[in-house]
Curated annotation (Swiss-Prot):
It is found in: Cytoplasm. InterPro entries: Adenylat/UMP-CMP_kin, Adenylat_kinase_CS, P-loop_NTPase. AMP binds at residues 33, 38, 59-61, 85-88, 92, 129, 140. Monomer. Belongs to the adenylate kinase family. NCBIfam families: PRK00279.1-3, PRK14527.1, PRK14531.1, PRK14532.1. It catalyses: AMP + ATP = 2 ADP. It comes from Prochlorococcus marinus (strain NATL2A). Disulfide bonds: none annotated. This is Adenylate kinase.
Length: 182
């Protein structure tokens, strides 16, 4: 079983849910940049306030900020890990690759969870987070298509991408992920 993983997919695809299940079952450390950023916002720090302003508009937090958060976490992990919500663009992917080479922890697998837009919007609106209103969601999906979708080709070319249909029940999606990482 691969132990250094990345889950990709649009907002609301179920990356966090699947990552939590996978990490719990296989003892990996779950690194969710969304959770790390929300924790920073909740702390009320200057950085958290700045991040909240960006996130509430549905925009992406700067590469430098997210990379420094991820680097701080990865530096303290010797066992397996699963990244969820990072990288979000080719620049971040290249920075992540350099970081992982530096700490001798190369990425072993990437799971792309694919979900139809209408299903995503419904799922996100029902989730009820402050940054989950329809206008913000539509903007987040647009940014995902523009910035994050190119990662699919990047990881395909590296031979480490597995695509999973995410419209099914949680258990079905989880089973598909397990089989693909076998």
């Amino acid at each position: 079983m691969k132990k250094k993983l990345l889950f990709l997919g649009p907002p609301g695809a179920g990356k966090g849910t699947q990552a939590n299940l996978f990490c719990k079952k296989y003892g990996l450390i779950h690194l969710s940049t969304g959770d790390l950023l929300r924790d920073e916002v909740s702390s009320g720090s200057v950085l958290g306030i700045k991040a909240a302003e960006i996130m509430n508009k549905g925009e992406l937090v700067s590469d430098e900020l997210v990379l420094s958060i991820v680097e701080g976490r990865l530096a303290n992990i010797n066992e397996g890990w699963l990244l969820d919500g990072f990288p979000r663009n080719v620049n971040q992917a290249n920075s992540l690759k350099n970081l992982l080479e530096k700490i001798n922890q190369p990425l072993e697998g990437v799971i792309l969870i694919k979900v139809a837009d209408d299903y995503l919007i419904k799922r996100l609106v029902e989730r009820g987070r402050q940054d989950d209103n329809e206008q913000v969601i539509t903007n987040r999906l647009k940014i995902y298509r523009e910035k994050t979708s190119p990662l699919i080709d990047l990881y395909k070319k590296q031979g480490i991408l597995e695509e999973i249909e995410g419209n099914a029940d949680i258990d079905v999606v989880f089973s598909c992920i397990e089989k693909s990482l076998g």
